[in-house]
Amino acid sequence: MGKTLYEKVWEAHEVRRLRNGQSQLFIDLHLLHEVTSPQAFGMLKDLGLKVRYPHRTFATVDHIVPTHDRTEPFQDPLAQSMLEALRHNTQEHGITFFDLGSGNQGIVHVIGPQLGLTQPGMTIACGDSHTSTHGAFGAVAFGIGTSQVRDVLATQTLAAQKLKVRRINVEGKLAPGVYAKDVILHLIRHLGVKGGLGYAYEYGGSAVEAMDMESRMTLCNMSIEGGARVGYVNPDETTFRYLEGRPYVPKGAEWEEAKKRWLAWRSDPDASYDDVVTFRAEEIAPTVTWGITPGQAIPIDGRIPLLEELPEEERPVAEEALAYMGFQPGQPIKGVPIQVAFIGSCTNARLSDLREVARYLKGHRVKKGVRALVVPGSEWVAKRAEEEGIAEIFREAGFEWRNPGCSMCLAMNPDRLEGDELCASSSNRNYKGRMGSPRGRTVLMSPLMVAAAAVAGEIADAREVFGVVGAR
């Protein structure tokens, strides 16, 4: 019987079985940022240990950096100390660090693929829950905690429990105006925020195969919001077209050999899965969240569910969400006023995201009273967007064009909500207080839907605001 990509990668990287049932896995690529690494380096120092394989470890700064004014020292002394600690630790241990102004600084899950560090068949670890993003390339990528960051630094291995594999097919063709962000919100809505517990998600089907790599990254990025620690797509020619020529990818004859090797990681046609579910692409509409979990989502033309329509176990969280968001059961989501619009994060801050929005935003203006930010995912993305005139389109429309970083996705930098502001956001989490204010509200949606909300001043259908649009 054939094997899944997950099984092949696991078996190839398994060093040994541990007594507790876990496996010790070799990690091909370890990505670091400034928030979860200082304590890990401190523990390493206390133990008198060095980084085992510095050449397999790469770092950047993203979570705490201001996106408006990056003049040092930062106004936040804690943020400045985190940056300085990362500079010191990477220099001391001989680790490549993509610092501010290097041309390659950015959100860790944007720069890994962008530089070609992320490759098929790899095991990848990072002290960040959205490490599953890298699975878009056919890698098995884990988000890990600080003590595990220490372990990987010291041994280049990780103790992990083998997961079951669920195949998620999305068949058919996405309708105009429907994007990968809508797909993953739709999947989480139907499978649940805990539906993926104990599973790795393998995404496939004709709609996924038709996606470009940056759309696949969006899909895999939010696997963790659906409870799955790992999400991946089998590598194919789309993967290779994206990777070819990137700085850390093999060149010449080695490139041809790498492609053959990478194709062998694909799940076999007769692979056995622990579960298989299928969705029709045509049934997926532009989707937005209405509550305080990514699973509390509805189509843009939908209404917030009545409590009696929900399974009994979901009602307490729904009641909590309604109270926090200030919504009513049965209320249409379209037309809800917004105060802030945010395009960015490791989910949707790549060049293709910005290109797609600029394509339709040109000639439109942000509604008076709406604060709109666009934060490129990396310095490379920002530079290309400037060169292509994308940044100017955003500026002319009334968006603030910021420097790269995690920005409003989380409350670790100056970009925050105030009071009970409602933010239309292309990020991945809508938890209570996620954007800094204990009363701030987040509604998740695709980047183009965020732009539509910014222009309309309310949650709106991008297909109506901008006219007929094409799927990507």
Question: What do the PLM-derived regions correspond to, one by one?
Answer:
Residues 1-472:
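Fe-S-dependent hydro-lyases/dehydratases of central metabolism
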